[in-house]
Amino acid sequence: MSLQGFQQALTDLVMSPALRARVAEDPSACLAGYDLSDLERRRLEALARDPRVRTPTLLHRSFRLSMIANTLPRSCKALGPRGLRELTHAYWGEGPPRTMQFVKEALRFGGYALGRLRDGSFQHDFLEELLETEMAALTLDRSGAAWEAGERAVPDDLAFRTPRLHPACRVIPWRHDPDAVLAALDAGRPLEGFEEGEHCLLLAAAGAGKLITKTFGTAERRALLAADGTRTVGDLCAELDLPGRVFAELVAAGWLV
């Protein structure tokens, strides 16, 4: 007899209606992976058929949903009840939670949702950019890095420097105007009528939990996304067909280092 095996099986049954259905249909096969006594196995078989187990399942799912809704609020709002239900139920069906920490669970769910968007199994025009933005904000908040405002000196040999994004910053490419989309979402307006283009949203951790956001147009977007610390400004200007002043302004502002 293994109390740990019984507790694990019971936890899995409470968390997964799909597992309960499988256990009710074929208990021997579904419970074979747990270290159980005959008595424990019979108890679990009975529980799998007991409709009252739905109540703790609902409580568990409410808690898991709160972990996502409190950390990825705009993504959840954009999804709406139907889309959120579809994604979360599919995500929960992948297996039990691996953590009870809100941020870790949000990042894990976000990674799952991004995977669904990129393989085409889930469709949403705005979710990818919203998820990437909120996930970047969560990551920055935990990083301990801080960006400080102020004018920086631009080196005379900038053309030979290999710039990269400030470590306390993240840049998220957007296909729509971030300011317009976020304003509409926060005001409860439908996400409709937005033209596609080359936009980006820069996030900067400023310390003490403060997050600075700034939107950029096409030229700055290309420069910020391409500056990975491996190519010189001269090479980037030639490759992207950009004037050197774009990089000079980003360095002066401290977005690139």
Predicted segments, located by residue:
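Long, charge-rich, low-complexity alpha-helical segments
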Residues: 1-156, 206-257
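Low-complexity, glycine/alanine/valine/leucine- and proline-rich hydrophobic stretches
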Residues: 161-229
